[in-house]
């Protein structure tokens, strides 16, 4: 699993996603 973004220091987001308002990812 490729992680390019870490939301809140722990939640891993894949390359095509960014951090949402909560500790989760949303597609961009």
UniProtKB/Swiss-Prot annotation:
Location(s) in or outside the cell: Secreted
Tissue specificity remark: Expressed by the venom duct.
Record bears the keyword Secreted: yes
Species per Swiss-Prot/TrEMBL record: Californiconus californicus
This protein's record includes keyword Secreted: yes
Keyword list, A-Z: Disulfide bond, Ion channel impairing toxin, Knottin, Neurotoxin, Secreted, Toxin
Free-text domain note: The presence of a 'disulfide through disulfide knot' structurally defines this protein as a knottin. The cysteine framework is VI/VII (C-C-CC-C-C).
Name under which the protein is recorded: Conotoxin Cal6.43b
Principal location: secreted
The protein's role, per its UniProt record: Probable neurotoxin with unknown target. Possibly targets ion channels.
GO cellular component: extracellular region
GO molecular function list: ion channel regulator activity; toxin activity
Disulfide bridge positions per record: 3-13, 7-19, 12-25
């Amino acid at each position: 699993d490729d992680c390019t973004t870490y939301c809140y220091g722990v939640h891993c987001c894949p390359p095509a996603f960014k951090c949402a308002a909560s500790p989760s990812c949303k597609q961009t």
